[in-house]
Each structure stands twice: as C-alpha cells, then as structure tokens.
Amino acid sequence: MLRRHQRFLAYGAAGWLFEVLFTGAKGPVRDGDWRLAGHTYLWMLPIYGSSAYLFEPAHNALRERPWWQRGTAYAAGFFAVEAASGAAIRRATGEIPWDYRRARGNRPVPANWRGLCRPLYAPVWFVAGLGLEHLHDRLSPPPTPPSPAATPRKRPETASDLA
C-alpha cells in the first residue's frame, strides 16, 4: 500500500496523463487537427493529486451506494474542486488555464459558470470518478470487513430479560 504523499503523486501523474490524452483526442473532433497534440498545465498536478485527500474519503463513504449515485456525487465533487481551484488560481495570477469564457476559434463561447466549470463535462467527471475508484483500490486496497468469528456474539434473550 502506498503512503498518502505517494498516492498524491500517483493521482497527479494519472490526471496529467488523462488530460493530455483528452485534449489530444479533442483536436480532430473540434478542429480537424490530426496532430493529436495534447497538453496540460503544471497547476494540474496538485489539483489532481488532491484526490488522495478528497476523493478517497468520498469513495470510502460511498462504496455501498449504487454506481449512479456514486458517479453523480463524484461529478459534483469534481465541479466543486474545479471551481475552487480555478478561483484560487485566478485570484493568484489573474487568469486560469481552462477559462471556459474564451471562444475557441469561430465557435461560440460554451455554456459555463464564471469560466470555471462547463456543464457539458458532467458525464466526463461522472465516468472519471467511477474510473478513479479502481485506481484508488489499486493504490490503497479497501479494508476487509471483520470475520464473523471476530464479531462478539449477542447473548440470547431469556424470559428474565423481558420481564
């Protein structure tokens, strides 16, 4: 099992990798650009790495819920992190790398909230959260439930207990 700071780096690296793949795959679809040039930002390592501190406890708390409830909760959580981290970066630097208020080429400005979040990405975050469950379980296996032998037995009720 990896320590938390090691998992921080693993989530950060995985996030960078998937962002580069995602942005590279959008080129042909969005612009007809078949160079498949993906990119990310140094800012993203700590943002993705924060999954070790934010996503893991949420996943542990939601393990018994149906997949669609977990995915919805993860998407909402990712939107919250995207908005909070984007607002912090904007406050520190005056802009954010993924500002959704910018037009892309001759396309209109996409629906967004303050340039920080795009509702269109909800399915992406939904699926990403469910995918992160598998990464989390590989990096830090879930605790095993106690065996029945280790669970104290309840004393059977007697007539004197009921009186």
Identify the role of each PLM range:
Residues M1-A163:
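Aromatic-rich, lipid-facing transmembrane alpha helices and their immediate juxtamembrane interface loops
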